[in-house]
């Protein structure tokens, strides 16, 4: 379905409003103005947001919108927008929709022609990336890793060869297990940055090969407390890495030709080193 934003002034607007991830001084002037002006604020946790609004002296009507009710309540909020009410969407901390509720509401509004107005602001993933010292021109945000070890390892194996910098959120009680799984799947030399309690009093940003990082975290239980972001170095292509299409060609040729000849032809077709393909084929056989 095509999505467009309405210029109909009789309809309200949905504002996507980031809130601080720790330091309350990080809220923007524009965010405060919007929160003060809207008719309704849709919040992940109305008690938490109520305290934030109280701190800034803002009196506003709050509407609970969370993972368990979003699909049902999206239509309720859409009706209010169509009546001309302006609504702000906030999460407990950071930018809404980034690992927080809001997707169904935003999509519902866009499909109905309601204008969605995004405000820039705090985001733990981007804040951590900016200080990690890892390539930031291309990165991949993965949210939380699965809760159980098998799921985590399967997820890590699926992105093992991903060259982009990887960003994960992690919880205090799973940090050690996740780091151990990263060591097991990606290897202890993969560089990882742990950013915890960003913008807060005990903010810590520490990077090291993940085997060393795991040992560092184990040394002090305080190092695994708080809100966590893991920034993982992307896979670095090695000279011996072989493209998947070259390996498929090699397998087809091996069925009809001697191994050495098959490796030579596959190498010529794909522009890779003959010896590397030949070595790979020998390893597969033995």
Curated annotation (Swiss-Prot):
A GO molecular-function descriptor: rRNA (cytosine-2'-O-)-methyltransferase activity
Compartment(s) of residence: Cytoplasm
Classification via SUPFAM superfamilies: Tetrapyrrole methylase
Coiled coil spans: none
Pfam families reported for this sequence: RsmI_C, TP_methylase
Gene Ontology annotations for the cellular component aspect, listed alphabetically: cytoplasm
Entry-linked InterPro entries: 4pyrrol_Mease, 4pyrrol_Methylase_sf, 4pyrrole_Mease_sub1, 4pyrrole_Mease_sub2, rRNA_ssu_MeTfrase_I, RsmI_HTH, SAM_MeTrfase_RsmI_CS
Keyword match Transport: no
EC number: 2.1.1.198
Gene Ontology biological-process annotations: rRNA processing
Keyword Nuclease listed: no
Domain of life: Bacteria
Assigned keywords, A-Z: Cytoplasm, Methyltransferase, rRNA processing, S-adenosyl-L-methionine, Transferase
Enzyme superclass (EC): transferase
Catalytic reactions on record: cytidine(1402) in 16S rRNA + S-adenosyl-L-methionine = 2'-O-methylcytidine(1402) in 16S rRNA + S-adenosyl-L-homocysteine + H(+)
Entries under Gene3D superfamilies matching the protein: Cobalt-precorrin-4 Transmethylase, Domain 1, Methyltransferase, Cobalt-precorrin-4 Transmethylase, Domain 2
Main location: cytoplasm
Function summary: Catalyzes the 2'-O-methylation of the ribose of cytidine 1402 (C1402) in 16S rRNA. In vitro, active on the assembled 30S subunit, but not naked 16S rRNA or 70S ribosomes.
Cited PANTHER family: RIBOSOMAL RNA SMALL SUBUNIT METHYLTRANSFERASE I
UniProt record similarity statement: Belongs to the methyltransferase superfamily. RsmI family.
Protein name: Ribosomal RNA small subunit methyltransferase I
Gene encoding the protein: rsmI
């Amino acid at each position: 379905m095509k999505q467009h934003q309405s210029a109909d002034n009789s309809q309200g607007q949905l504002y996507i409003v980031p809130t601080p991830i720790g330091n309350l001084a990080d809220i923007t002037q524009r965010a405060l103005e919007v929160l003060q002006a809207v008719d309704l604020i849709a919040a992940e946790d109305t008690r938490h947001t109520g305290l934030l609004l109280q701190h800034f002296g803002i009196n506003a009507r709050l509407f609970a919108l969370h993972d368990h009710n979003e699909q049902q309540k999206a239509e309720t909020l859409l009706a209010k927008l169509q009546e001309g009410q302006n609504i702000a969407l906030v999460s407990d901390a950071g930018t809404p929709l980034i690992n927080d509720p809001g997707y169904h509401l935003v999509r519902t509004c866009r499909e109905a022609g309601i204008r969605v107005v995004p405000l820039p602001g705090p985001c733990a993933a981007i804040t951590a990336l900016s200080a990690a010292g890892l390539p930031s021109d291309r990165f991949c945000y993965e949210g939380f890793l699965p809760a159980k070890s098998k799921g985590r390892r399967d997820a890590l194996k699926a992105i093992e060869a991903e060259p982009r910098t990887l960003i994960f959120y992690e919880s205090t009680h799973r940090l050690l297990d996740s780091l151990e799984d990263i060591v097991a799947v990606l290897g202890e030399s993969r560089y990882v940055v742990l950013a915890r309690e960003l913008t807060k009093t005990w903010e810590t940003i520490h990077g090291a090969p993940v085997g060393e990082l795991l040992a560092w975290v184990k040394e002090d239980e305080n190092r695994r407390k708080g809100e966590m972001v893991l920034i993982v170095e992307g896979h670095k292509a090695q000279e011996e890495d072989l493209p998947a299409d070259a390996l498929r060609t090699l397998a087809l040729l091996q069925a009809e030709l001697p191994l050495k000849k098959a490796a030579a032809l596959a190498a010529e077709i794909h522009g890779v080193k003959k010896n590397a393909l030949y070595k790979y084929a020998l390893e597969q056989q033995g």
